[in-house]
Curated annotation (Swiss-Prot):
Domain (Globin): residue spans on this chain: 18-162
Residues holding heme b: H76, H111
UniProt entry keywords in alphabetical sequence: Heme, Iron, Metal-binding, Oxygen transport, Signal, Transport
Pfam family, one: Globin
Miscellaneous comment: There are at least 12 different components in Midge globin. There are at least nine genes for VIIB variants.
Protein family according to the UniProt entry: Belongs to the globin family.
Annotated organism of origin: Chironomus thummi piger
Listed GO CC annotations: extracellular region; hemoglobin complex
Protein name: Globin CTT-VIIB-7
MF annotations from Gene Ontology: heme binding; metal ion binding; oxygen binding; oxygen carrier activity
Record InterPro entries: Erythrocruorin, Globin, Globin-like_sf, Globin/Proto, Mb-like_M
Amino acid sequence: MKFFAVLALCVVGAIASPLSADEANLVKSSWDQVKHNEVDILAAVFAAYPDIQAKFPQFAGKDLASIKDTAAFATHATRIVSFFTEVISLSGNQANLSAVYALVSKLGVDHKARGISAAQFGEFRTALVSYLQAHVSWGDNVAAAWNHALDNTYAVALKSLE
């Protein structure tokens, strides 16, 4: 689930200050608008932050244009986005809080082992939000919901990096 799996972090939103049902629905509905754009999402992250691409051994040092249309890239992007979709589907329901927390905590631990820094988590957040703004129905309410979810999620994931 390499670095792109941090997208899953974007949807937890139920840790320190739970997302409201409306916020969770905004995150879910906006994600539904892009969840089938796996390759484009991963390519956007890599284009914005080549240091993130460098953390993926199978893609490190390669020209993004030369790998974007490969089966390996599509397979990896799909695996990651599917993980995010699972986490997003769990968000907004208090009964799922422990499952989401466990997934995000494990994600942080796994990424610590890969040498991912808090700064790279921040880069990913920036790239993700930029992608979402350009590809979904985006307004102040959607931005607030994603920021709330990201703030909560990063609190858990970054703690795992310590």
